[in-house]
Regions:
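Core alpha/beta nucleotide-donor-binding catalytic domains of modification enzymes
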Residues: 1-202, 228
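AMP-forming adenylation/ATP pyrophosphatase catalytic core
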Residues: 2-5, 9-26, 38, 46, ...
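Short coil/turn linker and secondary-structure boundary residues
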Residues: 89-92, 139, 161, 188, ...
């Protein structure tokens, strides 16, 4: 790889970049290339190495190599040590814990030095591995898109550069690099794919790595279009309130849009089977589905609700007369003197006698609540809400002015 064939770093001039430097060929080549473009692009560079405290003396040697490299390249160097074995979360694998702690450390350093981006040395071979792993897990369109060149505070400029080109660059420049021997054994699924799976694919399908990287780029392009369509659908159909979230008329959405909406609201970790069940629920007239320990979906005619669990309803609050009374997450009710005129045109404003409000509270509904709507006899509030076609999930989110089990005003619905 000669100077003319260096990757095109598509960044604005004057950026401050933090290079994630492991000491391996990929990140060493990245640091060297950025150092060559530093003046041309008016870059402010720094490098960070995270020692995971896993490989003992080898880890310390990696850190020392990175420090010496940065001295030669005139790049400020930051070292942070994390104890991966001691910091693993319950059920977390060593590789996952190392990645989590590494990114946390890099972000701490980025914040401390005021860098615009953390620059990562993921290359074409890494992208091919990532896409294949996602496909084998059945992760869908987002997984097929692999890694994005830019995401949040991360920048990956080498995704179209093969690993062999980076190693050739270093060989041409006479620059050594460190080798993590754990990467040379098939001790993890990714290692097995790198050492055996991809070489076998390349043997049968020459150019497989490049093809997978191109596929990922195409999928990311498609995904951006689909995410914009999801944004437009949610802008028109999504409501949020104390009850949770509501999608109006979900059955009008194309299934591809609907699946992405569900992933957006339920989290990307929702299983494929659950995704299919939720899609079917959206097409049905009524039904409920427990999505997880903290989320339930409920379908009513014309809407689907995503309700947090457990449902925590606020305690009744004594009504301030006059004054304002707040019900946590439900809003504020203002009581003030008013002339005896009708305000029936506004369901959120009503005139009540002061003596009727004595001892009243602001609360949500309870079993046995009763109300006497204007022009009607005494009725169960639940029957009134059913007649008014108030969806069941909304009923628990309805603020009520009440004395005992007597409802004086179901806010937005009717007055007693």
């Amino acid at each position: 790889m000669n100077r003319a064939s260096l990757p095109d770093f598509s960044i604005a001039r004057g950026r401050r970049l933090l290079i994630a430097l492991s000491g391996g060929a990929d990140s060493v080549a990245l640091a060297w290339m950025l150092a060559q473009r530093r003046d041309e692009l008016d870059l402010t560079l720094a490098a960070a190495h995270v020692d995971h405290s896993i490989r003992g003396a080898e880890s310390r040697a990696d850190a020392e190599y990175c420090r010496e490299l940065c001295e030669r390249l005139d790049i400020p160097f930051y070292l942070e040590r994390v104890d991966v074995p001691a910091s693993r979360l319950p059920g977390e694998g060593i590789e996952t814990a190392a990645r989590r702690l590494r990114y946390e450390a890099l972000r701490r350093i980025r914040t401390r030095i005021g860098a615009d981006w953390i620059v990562l040395a993921h290359h074409m071979d890494d992208q091919a591995e990532t896409v294949l792993m996602h496909l084998l897990r059945g992760s869908g369109p987002d997984g097929a898109g692999g890694m994005a060149e830019r995401s949040d505070d991360l920048y990956r400029p080498l995704l179209n550069t093969p690993k062999r080109a980076l190693e050739q660059l270093l060989a041409d420049q006479g620059i050594p690099w460190r080798t993590d021997r754990t990467n040379l054994t098939p001790c993890t699924p990714r290692n097995a794919l790198r050492l055996h799976g991809l070489p076998a694919l390349e043997e049968s399908y020459p150019g497989a790595r490049a093809a997978l990287a191109r596929h990922a780029e195409s999928m990311r392009c498609e995904n951006r279009f689909m995410e914009a369509a999801v944004d437009a659908f949610l802008c028109e159909h999504l409501d949020s309130g104390p009850y949770g979230q509501r999608i109006r008329d979900p059955e009008t959405a194309d299934e591809a849009i609907l699946r992405r909406v569900i992933r957006r609201l339920c989290g990307s970790s929702v299983s494929h089977d659950m995704l299919l069940s939720l899609t079917a629920l959206c097409r049905s007239a009524r039904g409920r589905l427990r999505v997880s320990a903290s989320l339930q979906a409920e379908k009513t005619p014309g809407a689907i609700y995503f309700l947090p669990l457990p449902r925590e309803l606020p305690e009744p609050t004594a009504l301030a007369i006059p004054g304002e009374t707040s019900l946590e997450h439900f809003g504020t009710l203002r009581v003030q003197p008013a002339p005896p005129v009708s305000v029936r045109d506004d369901p959120f404003r009503q005139v009540l006698r002061t003596d009727a409000l004595s001892g009243a509270v602001l609360r949500t509904r309870r079993d046995g609540d009763r109300i006497r709507p204007l022009g009607c006899g005494d009725r169960l509030l639940s029957d009134v809400l059913t007649d008014r076609k108030i969806d069941r999930p909304l009923r628990d989110a309805l603020p009520l002015v009440a004395r005992g089990n007597r409802i004086l005003w179901a806010v937005g619905v009717c007055i007693s």
